[in-house]
Amino acid sequence: MNIINNSENVCTGVKIWLCICCIGILIMVFIGGITRLTHSGLSITEWNPVIGIFPPVTEKMWIAEKIKYMATPEYKYITSNITLTEFKKLYLIEYFHRLLGRIVGLVFLIPFLYFMYKQKLSKNLIHRFILIAFLILVQGVMGWYMVKSGLIDRPHVSHYRLAMHLLLALAIFYLLWKHFLLSVVHQIKCNIKVTNTSVFYIIISLITIQITCGALVAGLNAGLLSKDIPFLSDKVGLNDLLFIKPWWHNIYNNPITVQFIHEVIALLILIIAVITLLVLKVRIFPMYLLLALLLIQLTLGILTFIYNVPIILASLHQVTAFILFASSIYLLHYVKLLQIKYVENKI
């Protein structure tokens, strides 16, 4: 994750484009959370990248779509009493999510082709943006692969595929955000000496793991479990955390264990961030920003858990995780600039 040596000078148009793409990903993540929490994701049973742009418009078309939905496990086991009006609401949420995905893809692709044609991008950037375009395509396929897992024999999607879908979004967001930072943040004014960047890589790694764990929590509906804290309550203990055999399967299949790990990692990130600020004395704006976002995210997470995963709170919790990740990348970028400035001053 060397984001300093690859600095690029690009025109203002490219900077604005990258910023818009990053915002587009964040909106997608937020809408994706709403789609999952309203149980809308399985309402569209086919994947038509081109024809799927057009929603049903007549009553006959809507009935045809509902008949397809009636063949799904979700309808058979959970929503068998759903009315056509209720089905339309679910369908349109999933439709909007897919449509927004197409729009974000085009918002990236069309300006990319334009800037490449106008020779506004270096060869290195062109190669990296081709990778991003490929990942966006893969993300579309992954989204359908995830949905398909809930159309066969279970009324819910695979939590593994859900996690992969979210991680692909994170990878795309990281690449876009990294290049935006490289194009915007070149110089800094403070002169703090930072000799070691290991702690910042640790923070980024833990946030990435935490986002993955959060996806598993969502996929396993772990947020709806008992609010008793393991080891601090007589109701939840070691046997509940490790009841699946072999024991390591609990890490990604046991909702109680996954939720517990999610909480532990959150506290660990907070402790490391506070130590970095107070003990290592990395008192710079990006560090304060990270800590503020971390406190906001912890508050959102606690409220989401206490109030049994309300849709808006849980969706905000999901998108704030990406913003927190972005702030950690910004922090690392800033620290590396500090190191370069320190070396230049010595010379």
From Swiss-Prot:
The alphabetized UniProt keywords are: Cell membrane, Heme biosynthesis, Iron, Membrane, Metal-binding, Oxidoreductase, Transmembrane, Transmembrane helix
Q: Where does heme bind?
A: 262, 317
Q: Which GO terms describe its molecular function?
A: metal ion binding; oxidoreductase activity, acting on NAD(P)H, heme protein as acceptor
EC top class, as a word: oxidoreductase
E.C. designation(s):
1.17.99.9
Has UniProt tagged this entry with the keyword GTP-binding?
Answer: no
Q: Pfam families this protein is in?
A: COX15-CtaA
Q: What residue intervals traverse the membrane? A: 14-34, 96-116, 129-149, 162-182, 199-219, 260-280, 287-307, 311-331
- Places the protein is found: Cell membrane
The primary site where this protein sits is membrane
Which cofactors does this protein require? heme b
- One GO BP annotation here? heme A biosynthetic process
Annotated GO CC locations: plasma membrane
Q: Which reaction does it catalyse?
A: Fe(II)-heme o + 2 A + H2O = Fe(II)-heme a + 2 AH2
Task: Name the InterPro entries on file.
Answer: COX15/CtaA_fam, HemeA_Synthase_type2
Part of which pathway? Answer: Porphyrin-containing compound metabolism; heme A biosynthesis; heme A from heme O: step 1/1
Record's bilayer topology term: Multi-pass membrane protein
Similarity-based family: Belongs to the COX15/CtaA family. Type 2 subfamily.
Q: How does it assemble?
A: Interacts with CtaB.
Question: What does the record give as the function of this protein?
Answer: Catalyzes the conversion of heme O to heme A by two successive hydroxylations of the methyl group at C8. The first hydroxylation forms heme I, the second hydroxylation results in an unstable dihydroxymethyl group, which spontaneously dehydrates, resulting in the formyl group of heme A.
Specify the protein name. Heme A synthase
Organism for this UniProt entry? Ehrlichia ruminantium (strain Gardel)
Upper lineage is: Bacteria, Pseudomonadati, Pseudomonadota, Alphaproteobacteria, Rickettsiales
Gene name, per UniProt, is: ctaA
